[in-house]
Swiss-Prot record:
InterPro entries according to UniProt: Ribosomal_bL12 (IPR000206), Ribosomal_bL12_C (IPR013823), Ribosomal_bL12_C/ClpS-like (IPR014719), Ribosomal_bL12_oligo (IPR008932), Ribosomal_bL12_oligo_N_sf (IPR036235)
Family: Belongs to the bacterial ribosomal protein bL12 family.
Keyword set, alphabetical order: Chloroplast, Plastid, Ribonucleoprotein, Ribosomal protein
Purpose of the protein: Forms part of the ribosomal stalk which helps the ribosome interact with GTP-bound translation factors. Is thus essential for accurate translation.
Domain of life: Eukaryota
Gene name in the database record: rpl12
UniProt key word Ribonucleoprotein: yes
Subunit relationships: Homodimer. Part of the ribosomal stalk of the 50S ribosomal subunit. Forms a multimeric L10(L12)X complex, where L10 forms an elongated spine to which 2 to 4 L12 dimers bind in a sequential fashion. Binds GTP-bound translation factors.
Gene3D superfamilies in the cross-refs: 3.30.1390.10, Single helix bin
Protein name: Large ribosomal subunit protein bL12c
Cellular component annotations (GO), alphabetically ordered: chloroplast; cytosolic large ribosomal subunit
Subcellular location: Plastid, Chloroplast
Length: 130
């Protein structure tokens, strides 16, 4: 059982991309399809992680903040927040808030997007990050 333990320990050290490549090589070498194998209860999260493709391992770097819904009773508070974030004038911000869904900020970092989302949600609006 020592060989198996060694192999398992080495697999634990692999990155997600390396684990994905390992799964592909095992499938090719042994002519099996891992996606058809039913995981044993308790191990499913570990097996699912190793089956992810390299595309799913990519981290999104740029985010868009989209104002989705503005409740009428929260409009003034949301208008103030939108003005402070966008730098729009009063008239432009009013038109912006009344024409949802609208992109508030585009291609920003995840941290900035989360901060803006929190500000707008605190004012009472619905926001989506994409």
């Amino acid at each position: 059982m020592d060989k198996i333990d060694e192999i398992v320990e080495k697999i634990k050290l692999l990155s997600l991309l390396e684990a994905s490549e390992l799964v592909k090589r095992i499938e090719d070498t042994f002519q099996v399809n891992v996606s058809n194998i039913q995981p044993v209860t308790g191990l499913s999260s570990n097996l699912t992680t190793t089956q992810q493709t390299p595309e799913s391992a990519e981290v999104k770097e740029k985010w868009d903040v989209i104002l989705e819904n503005v409740p009428a009773d929260k409009k003034i508070a949301i208008l103030k927040v939108v003005r402070s974030i966008t730098g729009l004038g009063l008239k432009e911000a009013k038109e912006f808030v009344e024409s949802v869904p609208k992109i508030i900020k585009q291609s920003i970092s995840q941290a900035d997007a989360e901060h803006i989302k929190q500000q707008i949600e605190d004012a009472g609006a619905s926001v989506v990050l994409k």
